[in-house]
């Protein structure tokens, strides 16, 4: 029995980091916006059947000058297609607050944990207000962004800026949650951050000991140096 318990603990501890190492992001190709899951910098996108099937109830919202509006998400073999048109100045946010959790056992005590993946697409660098639990938003200043957790600035947290060919730049948010990047390359950037809240809480009537959040912000830099194209696509992860 003790051996079985040890194996279970090891397996759950292994599965959780695999999910958390991944992130979700939004990318726009013409008029089509798609939610992707995988490793943007590695050119890896999860599929169905596969890890994309782990998502339970991702919710998309359009945030614009006229207010907020729910958007549909159509699951395809290689991501979710976001329904509805997005205009300059709009933002799209997506979050899945029902992604399957996991459990760990230590000293005979079993604890539940959850992971909350989220993403934002900003069509301009104009200042935006946070909406997601963990959110990165433009401030309106060139190359400046702000990280929030539950509506409050989140200091001393790593934020990575990534482009499709894998180039990555890391910054740490200051006391006001602000980070600054040069954004020298022309094209798409995905900013990514992680935060774990160990205060515990409750989701769908079930208590959890910690909540791990991963969030991203997609922006387009209209000027700058041309970059090398992304490398060959990495194969999707093995389902587990």
What spans do the regions from the language model cover?
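Short amphipathic beta-strand segments in non-cytosolic proteins
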Residues: 58-68, 157-171
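Beta-strand-rich domain onsets/edges
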Residues: 21-32, 105-143, 205-240
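A short, solvent-exposed beta-strand micro-motif common in secreted/extracellular proteins
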Residues: 90-97, 188-196
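Short acidic/polar inter-strand loop motif in beta-rich domains
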Residues: 42, 98-104, 197-202
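Gram-negative bacterial Sec-dependent N-terminal signal peptides
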Residues: 1-20
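Glycine-centered loop-to-beta-strand initiation motif
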Residues: 76-82, 173-187
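Beta-strand-rich structural segments
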Residues: 31-44, 137-149
């Amino acid at each position: 029995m003790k051996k079985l318990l040890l194996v279970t603990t090891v397996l759950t501890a292994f599965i959780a980091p695999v999910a958390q190492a991944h992130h979700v992001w939004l990318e726009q190709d013409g008029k089509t916006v798609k939610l992707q899951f995988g490793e943007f910098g590695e050119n890896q996108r999860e599929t169905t059947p596969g890890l994309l099937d782990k998502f339970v109830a991702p919710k998309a919202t359009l945030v614009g000058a006229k207010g907020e509006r729910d958007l549909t998400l159509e699951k395809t073999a290689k991501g979710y297609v976001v329904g509805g048109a997005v205009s300059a100045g709009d933002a799209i946010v997506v979050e899945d607050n029902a992604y399957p959790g996991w459990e760990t056992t230590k000293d005979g005590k079993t604890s539940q944990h959850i992971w909350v993946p989220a993403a934002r697409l900003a069509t301009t660098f104009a200042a935006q207000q946070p909406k997601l639990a963990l959110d990165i938003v433009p401030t309106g200043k060139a190359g400046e962004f702000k990280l929030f957790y539950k509506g409050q600035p989140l200091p001393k947290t790593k934020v990575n800026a990534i482009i499709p060919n894998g180039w990555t730049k890391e910054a740490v948010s200051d006391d006001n949650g602000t980070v600054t990047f040069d954004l020298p390359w022309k094209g798409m950037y995905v900013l990514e951050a992680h935060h774990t809240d160990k205060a515990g809480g409750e989701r769908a009537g079930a208590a959890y000991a910690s909540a791990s959040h991963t969030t991203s912000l997609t922006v387009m830099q209209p000027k700058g140096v041309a970059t090398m194209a992304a490398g060959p696509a990495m194969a999707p992860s093995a389902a587990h």
